[in-house]
């Protein structure tokens, strides 16, 4: 039976920590299928040989995601996530549009 690890970059502490876990998983022939955060995990799954699948959420079904990411992750004709090609993670965050969802801001003094 194939083992699959549901490693989440936000839970693990970031991209570097996720990559360390991915390397350990690969050494044990474990596949990776991270949970959520498609804007991060699409890149990570595509970057490792043991990346199996990334979850996809339609931003139109979630008001916060729709406000946060005006240009959602796209799918190709086969239903596969198209990894953004723009610099960084390839997505723009609309900070002013998500301010109503914030419970705390580092700007609060």
For the regions a language model picked out, list residue spans one by one.
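Shared catalytic-loop signature of beta/alpha-barrel
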Residues: 1-80
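C-terminal extensions of enzymes
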Residues: 68-109
